[in-house]
């Protein structure tokens, strides 16, 4: 059955059906929650035009445990372990904010030795976090070696956690009034020796990634955040420093004894994924310097108490064996807990991911009336839509990696 292709007709007079204008719609896909690059239980509905992201809709709540509500029915000390389970990559930094809030409301002054130990372990937490963030972020864009190197150093830091408090991850080591117990005598030597070796590892990661052509193609000019964007979205931490704003609570609103330490605040210039990566690399070097200074200050500090003895903290064991009042205080402290005077306070620390804050409302009882947790990752994740819009699908994992998101704190 021959015909005339130009007239769209056949010899028998029949015509071809003309295809009407087809409506082309965008392609929707689910990114996660089982995706390895989602950094937890992130589910994102991505609307794609070809391979260009038109819309990214994050669905959170898959790890929601109702932490803030649970905290209202527990004593202040019982609430401490909940803080470990928020950003579980660097647990002690969250405990720090909780302890600071209670200490400000009760007017507790902690011993200097405890303050130095807190600074030391907060910086260990920062390195733990950045090693995880940088190396797994590199793996998301195709570099498989960095995690193998980074996790070796993380393992050594976890052992320092374990030697201080017995737990590798959920430490509950910072306590209202100080820290749970003093450090073993040889631990400071081992931490100092580790600090001497660590810059070599950062140099190796630097050599592997920083000037790597493929790595730069995947990160440069991806997920750009301007200074105005950072302020509008409530960014903190590396997200705001990568855009050129030198905002770090350790310097701008010093807590503990950070004002005694000498360290630099790395600041980016372009606000893209690459600058945020460079900031994290530089922060690891600075944290290492702070750790070395803390070790030297702890050596110079005479051995003394690491808890402010009073109503917030348990008595010494020797006192309990000698004194009935101390035994009663110990029993009451761990059954009823201590009472915090009525009032409200906001305490924030420069956690590795940004400003982690606790807004605590106390009503004079042994339990908090309300505790609001300000997680930095929550503010960062809510802007994933405009950050990834117009980028390729393959750029989304790179953006998520440099946002540095952990779902324990996002979902709470």
Swiss-Prot record:
PROSITE patterns assigned: COMPLEX1_49K
GO cellular component: plasma membrane
Example of a GO MF term: quinone binding
InterPro entries: NADH_Q_OxRdtase_suD, NADH_UbQ_OxRdtase_49kDa_CS, NDH1_su_D/H, NiFe-Hase_large
Topology within the bilayer: Peripheral membrane protein
Pfam families tied to this protein: Complex1_49kDa
Keywords associated with the record: Cell inner membrane, Cell membrane, Membrane, NAD, Quinone, Translocase, Transport, Ubiquinone
Principal localisation: membrane
EC numbers: 7.1.1.-
Subunit structure: NDH-1 is composed of at least 14 different subunits, Nqo1 to Nqo14. The complex has a L-shaped structure, with the hydrophobic arm (subunits Nqo7, Nqo8, Nqo10 to Nqo14) embedded in the inner membrane and the hydrophilic peripheral arm (subunits Nqo1 to Nqo6, Nqo9) protruding into the bacterial cytoplasm. The hydrophilic domain contains all the redox centers. NADH-quinone oxidoreductase forms a supercomplex with ubiquinol-cytochrome c reductase complex (complex III or cytochrome b-c1 complex) and cytochrome c oxidase (complex IV), which stabilizes the NADH-quinone oxidoreductase complex.
Known role: NDH-1 shuttles electrons from NADH, via FMN and iron-sulfur (Fe-S) centers, to quinones in the respiratory chain. The immediate electron acceptor for the enzyme in this species is believed to be ubiquinone. Couples the redox reaction to proton translocation (for every two electrons transferred, four hydrogen ions are translocated across the cytoplasmic membrane), and thus conserves the redox energy in a proton gradient.
PANTHER family to which the protein is assigned, alphabetical: NADH DEHYDROGENASE [UBIQUINONE] IRON-SULFUR PROTEIN 2, MITOCHONDRIAL, NADH-UBIQUINONE OXIDOREDUCTASE 49 KDA SUBUNIT
Record protein name field: NADH-quinone oxidoreductase subunit D
